[in-house]
Amino acid sequence: RNFAIGAADDQAKRAYDVLYRATEAGLAVARPGATCCDLFAAMRAVIATFDPGTGEVGRLGHGLGMQLTEWPSHAPFDNTVLRENMVITLEPSLGYGDGMIMVHEENIVVGDGPPRLLSARAPRDLPIIG
């Protein structure tokens, strides 16, 4: 989860908004029959609205199981087909400001219909503490 302490500048708020919307795009695609590269493309399209050059990462999520990071990878090269009951992460990220990076993560179970979140969804707006 992401939080700002005291205050958040406009760039941080915008980065958080883009990553929240990228996660929403991933949630909309995460259904049986979709591929990991479909997930990547959906999230990456939203990240590109922030800055077309940002988000050049190897992947935007992965499988979750006995290891912290497992197959499959949500990347343009992974054609793994999602199946019901797969447990995966959605992890869109982007660089912003002067060397800053923000990563948003939701862990989900792929289901017949909307995926099931394994924890409460992150707040819509960047939480500010203090």
Model-predicted segments: where are they?
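Active-site neighborhoods and metal-handling regions in enzymes and metal-associated proteins
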Residues: 1-130
